[in-house]
Amino acid sequence: MVHCAGCERPILDRFLLNVLDRAWHVKCVQCCECKCNLTEKCFSREGKLYCKNDFFRRFGTKCAGCAQGISPSDLVRRARSKVFHLNCFTCMMCNKQLSTGEELYIIDENKFVCKEDYLNNNNAAKENSFISVTGSDPSLSPESQDPLQDDAKDSESANVSDKEAGINENDDQNLGAKRRGPRTTIKAKQLETLKAAFAATPKPTRHIREQLAQETGLNMRVIQVWFQNRRSKERRMKQLSALGARRHAFFRSPRRMRPLVDRLEPGELIPNGPFAFYGDYQSEYYGPGSNYDFFPQGPPSSQAQTPVDLPFVPSSVPAGTPLGAMDHPIPGHHPSSDAQRFTDIMSHPPGDSPSPEPNLPGSMHSMSAEVFGQSPPFSSLSVNGGYGNHLSHPPEMNETAVW
C-alpha cells in the first residue's frame, strides 16, 4: 500500500503524482502559501511545496527598497550590488521614477535623490548657512555662557550684517526659481534695543541674552549671532580707520630728504675741505693739522724751521691737488732753498740712515724707519745725478701715492 507524502494516507485513487521521488495525492500537491493546485511545476523548500510566485517572493532576491521578494516576471533596476523594484527605484524627494542611465545620488545605500533635487537642496543649504545653527557648535548654542567663546567665533559667523538682518519684504520676488532659506527679520524697535544693549555690554552673558530675548521676542541664537557679527564689524571698522589714518599721515607729511653734507658735523664722514680727515691723525712723527701746507716764497719767519727740525718731509703739493708726478717746477718757487733743505736731510752720517751706492743714476733713496718711523705716503725720492752737498739744478721729484 502506497501512502501519500502530504497527508500520509494510503493512495486509493486511480492516478497519483510523483514529486521529489515520493507519491502524492493529486489534491495534496498544492502551494502551502496560497493553497493553489500545482499541476505543471512546483517549487520545494524544506519539504514544502510552493508555487512560483510564492517561492520567489519568500526565498528569492529581496528588493532593497521594500525588502520584499522579487518575482521572476518583475522588472527590476540595479544600483551597485542591490536590486530594486521599478516602483521602489524613485527619488525620495519628488517621487519621480528614475530611469536607466540617469544620474542620481545614493543616501544610506537604499535611498535615492535625483540630480536636480540634490543640487537645489545643496544650494539652499549653503544659502541658509548664514543663520542656520547646529547643536554640535558650542559657540552658537544657547547653553554657551562664556563670552570668550562667543568672541572666538565672531569671524566664522560674520556673514550677517545689520543690513542683511534688516527689514526686507521683497526677498521672495528676487529669489526666482531657487528658494532661499528663511531670513530673520529684525524690526526697527528690536534693532534699537539690541544696539543699546551692545553699547552697554558688547559681550553679554546668557542671562542678559535671555532678557533681550524676552524683550524683543527674538530667538536667543539669533541674538547671539547678531552680537557676534556686531563685534566683528566693530573690529573691521577700527582696523580700516587705523589704516586710513596711517595712510593719510604718510601722504600728507612725507619725510623730506636733506642733503647728506648738511646733516654731518665737521670732522665726520664728509668734513669741510678735501682730505681733511688726515688732519685728525696724530702721532710722534705727524703732528696735528694739515699735512699739505705749501709756501711758494718760503715759510713765514714765525714758522721758519730748518729741515732737521721738521717732523716730516715737507710736501710741495697744495691741499686739494690730485697726486701725481710733478715734472715741472712751480712758478714762483725757488729751487735753491728747497735744494739746500733736501741736501741737509740727505747729508746725515751713514750710521743714521743707510745710503745706496753712490754715482748710480736713478737710484732710490729710502728714508730710514728708525729716524722717520713709518714712511709717509711720499717715501721715495728719485734724484738724477746722485747725491751731493749742493744741487746744481732743481731735483725732479717723482711722488708715488700709496693708498
From Swiss-Prot:
- Please indicate which superkingdom the organism of origin belongs to: Eukaryota
Please give the name of this protein. LIM/homeobox protein Lhx1
Q: What is the lineage of its organism?
A: Eukaryota, Metazoa, Chordata, Craniata, Vertebrata
What is this protein for, i.e. what is its function?
A: Involved in the establishment of the body plan via the Spemann organizer during gastrulation. Transcriptional activator required to induce organizer gene expression downstream of siamois. Promotes head formation by binding to 5'-TAAT'-3' elements in the promoters of head organizer genes cer1 and gsc to stimulate expression. Binds as a complex with siamois and mix-A/mix.1 to the cer1 promoter, and with ldb1 and otx2 to the gsc promoter. Also involved in neural induction via the organizer, including a role in notochord formation.
Q: Which GO terms describe its biological process?
A: anterior/posterior pattern specification; axis specification; cell migration involved in gastrulation; chordate embryonic development; muscle organ development; nephron tubule development; neurogenesis; neuron differentiation
Q: Supply one GO molecular-function term.
A: sequence-specific DNA binding
**Composition bias type Polar residues, residue spans:** 131-147
Under Gene3D superfamilies, the record lists:
Cysteine Rich Protein, Homeodomain-like
Q: Where is the composition biased (Basic and acidic residues)?
A: 150-166
Q: Does the keyword RNA-binding apply?
A: no
Q: Which residue windows are transmembrane per the record?
A: none
Q: In which tissues is it expressed?
A: Exhibits a biphasic expression pattern. Initially localized to the Spemann organizer region of gastrulae, leading to expression in prechordal mesoderm and notochord. In the second phase, expressed in the lateral mesoderm and neural plate, eventually concentrating in the pronephros and the CNS. Expressed in the pronephros primordium by late gastrula (stage 12.5) and becomes restricted to the tips of the tubules and ducts as kidney development progresses. In the CNS, becomes progressively recognizable in anatomically distinct structures during larval development.
